[in-house]
Amino acid sequence: MMPTVIILAGGLGTRLRSVTHDHIPKPMVPVSYQGENYPFMSFLLSHLYGQGIRKIILCVDHLAEQIVSYFGDGHRYGMQITYDNAGPVLTAARVKQAMEKTDDYNVIIHCGDVFHPLNIDRFLQNFNQHPENLMQIAVHKKLRSEHTKPNLVIGKKGQVFDYKKKNAGENRLVLDTGVLIVRRGILSYISDSPEESLTENLYPELIKKNVVGTYESETAFYDVGTPAEYSRFCNYVEKVGIRPLLEQKSSANGVA
């Protein structure tokens, strides 16, 4: 059975204000498909549906009513969508509250402004081969872009040694793509503080414990958090023709 996916979709989208004008939440920015506009989130959900994912928890806050109004409970799309509105708290605090809504032992966490069409079966298989890890981060192997920079130091076997380092020494620098899978054991590392962040608090703590692995992919990914990357994703959709989430229909977008 496929795990629940927690999507972090509550950010203010400050870098994308020239597109949203603070009138729409970042996951709902319009993307054209066959002459009609669909929200970015519908393309992400379509990919997840095509990979067998059926249960989604959307962590919302900023202009949340627009997301809830559009997707509802997910029934008409063949999915089960629930919502968690923790208010203006940081990402680890959001994840902790959302994980309390599911009994799944493994949970996928996905940034709500990222489209990375991974093969979820392979992603899970790799995680299951490393039961010692509490977290596995999807990383890009060879990305070289003016808009993104490598931020994880990993060893030969994919174990994460450091975060936000510019020099890897004997190791390699790769880019965290905003998709990860975790075991419930991470909950013991997240305090009840609303100021708990995934990257600033949880990542360093788990890296020190040597329980963070990676899944490497060469599949192109898109972060619509900036106008340049948003435009790049729109061009990708136009060129490749990937489908948004449509009522009772699925889309198996390109996978790694």
Predicted features by range, described:
Residues 68-69, 74-156:
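Conserved beta-loop-beta/alpha segment of the NTase-like Rossmann-fold superfamily
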Residues 108, 115, 121-129, 143-144, ...:
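Catalytic-core segments of class I nucleotidyltransferases/pyrophosphorylases
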